[in-house]
């Protein structure tokens, strides 16, 4: 995840636009679930994955369209034959992908990526917060206890707290919210004092 956001920030610093593809929801049998991410760059190369196969291919192509239109959007894909949005797979699931356009001239987008990287370097609980209006993402920010809600004021901290879970959470409605864990604090237990264990211990 650090590599993905670092590469995005570098592209923006180099004056290049980039699209972040994020799975917001999945049901049935799908390659990856909510929270999977892939960055698509102007030359077509990608960092990260949302599951490979037809979903990733179609998403990469759609991301290149978003780079041209400069408009973020939400797109659903059906992984079952003979259905609307059928992409030729037979898994039987559904995937919703958010294509988020980042413009190198947008300081807010760059600040958001920098804030995400700061949280990824830490070891405290943190979340990505998305607000949905009319089925489209209208705002995105981060939340952690040390800094509170940043980069958006789309929801009050009091209303947000019940949605801060260890798994991705969707609150339907208009507005709706999608809350995704970014980092989760935890402990690692090392058993044994051999060469591997001693190398891992701080």
What are these regions (language model features)?
Residues 1-202:
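Segments forming oxygen-rich coordination pockets for charged ligands
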């Amino acid at each position: 995840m650090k590599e993905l956001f670092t590469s995005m920030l570098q592209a923006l610093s180099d004056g290049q636009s980039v699209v972040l593809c994020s799975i917001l929801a999945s049901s049935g049998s799908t390659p990856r679930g909510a929270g999977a991410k892939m960055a698509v760059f102007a030359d077509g190369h990608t960092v990260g994955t949302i599951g490979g196969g037809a979903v990733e291919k179609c998403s990469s192509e759609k991301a290149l369209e978003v780079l041209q239109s400069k408009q973020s959007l939400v797109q659903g894909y059906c992984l079952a034959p003979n259905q609307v949005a059928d992409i030729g797979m037979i898994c039987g699931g559904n995937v919703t992908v958010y294509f988020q356009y980042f413009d190198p001239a947008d300081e807010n987008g760059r600040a958001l990526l920098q804030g995400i990287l700061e949280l990824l370097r830490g070891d405290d609980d943190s979340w990505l917060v998305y607000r949905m209006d009319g089925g489209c993402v209208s705002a995105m920010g981060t939340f952690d206890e040390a800094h509170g809600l940043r980069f958006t004021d789309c929801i009050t901290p009091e209303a947000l707290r019940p949605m801060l879970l260890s798994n991705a959470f969707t609150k339907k409605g208009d507005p709706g919210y999608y809350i995704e864990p970014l980092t989760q604090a935890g402990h690692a237990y090392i058993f044994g004092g051999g060469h591997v264990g001693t190398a891992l211990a701080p």
